[in-house]
Amino acid sequence: VHWSEVELHEITTTWKSIDKHSLGAKALARMFIVYPWTTRYFGNLKEFTACSYGVKEHAKKVTGALGVAVTHLGDVKSQFTDLSKKHAEELHVDVESFKLLAKCFVVELGILLKDKFAPQTQAIWEKYFGVVVDAISKEYH
């Protein structure tokens, strides 16, 4: 994947400046509301809101992985090999769920960034999440 200087700047500076865990919790909660069948992977959770403990804890894991992708934009796939295997072989998460969560992250970024979330910015973040979804899906057969 080729990243332009504008794309690299947008992703790295925005990621540094935002409350990633809050963003992640809101994106997960949105996914659970809009796509309720995705809750099936979280049988241990009792609540599916952005302020619930379980959602916040999973958001930390998700945003931690997204942070790894931000710092390794030139080689996201190799960074996600183990995570992809875990989700494919142990957790049996449907690849489509990653795409749904990515959409929810983009929506939450738009809400957070408001006027700074121009169409070009949205396109950058959709590209980033597309790369991440591709990377976490690579071990699926």
Swiss-Prot record:
Chain residues that bind heme b: H58, H87
GO terms, biological process: hydrogen peroxide catabolic process
GO cellular component: blood microparticle; haptoglobin-hemoglobin complex; hemoglobin complex
Superkingdom assignment: Eukaryota
Domain Globin: 2-141
Listed InterPro entries: Globin, Globin-like_sf, Globin/Proto, Hemoglobin_b, Hemoglobin_oxygen_transport
Tissue: Red blood cells.
Family: Belongs to the globin family.
Assembly with partners or alone: Heterotetramer of two alpha chains and two beta chains.
Name of the protein in its database record: Hemoglobin subunit beta
Organism expressing this protein natively: Heterodontus portusjacksoni (Port Jackson shark)
Gene name per UniProt: HBB
